[in-house]
Amino acid sequence: MDLNQIKQKLESLQTQSNTNKGNGKSIFWKPSVGKQQVRIVPNKYNKSFPFTEMQFYYGIGQRVMASPMNWGEKDPIQEFTKQLRDSGDKENWYLAKKLDAKTRIFAPVLVRGEEEEGVKLWQFGKEVYQAFLNLAADAEVGDYTDVSGGRDIKLTTVGPEVTGTPYNKTTVSPSMKQSPISDNTNVVERSLDTQPNPIEVFKRLTFDEVKANLETFLKPEGGEEGEISSEKSVPFDGDSKNNYSLEGKDTTSKGDKFDNLFDDKKSNSGDDLPF
């Protein structure tokens, strides 16, 4: 056993842990039930747009997987779902819909009353995202991220007993008063210069790693096909397409369909698969 290699690995893991947690403090934040106030600060990594959209897969691997599409790379699951839809088979179309990546949005926020903890990443879905975009498009609200003349965002969050679902629901509204991020120049500078980057926070899997997770999900060791996580999400690509055609019952298992679509010996059907 190489003790030097073990020490190097330990140091690497500790460094990664410190980077992700920020000295033991989570870099992520989410609103709790009740009323809170935050300030969305200018995005250090994209000066013109404060929000970062990312694609994730839930329930396919042992952990949530960030899609390679987030880094502009080919995604085997996305290619697979395209082939499923193109087949015109109802079962395939349904499977493709369940396999689709879910969109999550991240915003850099300074939580009022917790400014000393620095900027956090707030993750939310389509409804809150649209509310923020609508506010930005409202001339009476304007740029609420402006350093000196922006607006705090007031949040009201209700729990499952109100929503009737297992999830909380948060509504947003702008403060009527314009204000700076902070009267403390150190807080302002730290908020602008020290921000976690969503793209760097999540593990970047290779094409082959994602493909292996998909194959394991479709053909687990026990012989039974896996189940997709029931992660709540709202699709970002509009209404689902229903104009597929049915050509009889297809008894091919999901695993066999996966093999067929990744088979180098199949006839050329004009698809865009890179393998």
Ranges and model annotations:
Residues 202-275:
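Acidic, gly/ser/pro-rich intrinsically disordered tails
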Residues 7-10, 144, 189, 243, ...:
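Generic N-terminal initiation segments characterized by hydrophobic and/or small/turn-forming residues
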Residues 1-143, 204-208:
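OB-fold ssDNA-binding interfaces and closely related basic DNA-contact patches used
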Residues 112-234:
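Compact mixed alphabeta submodule
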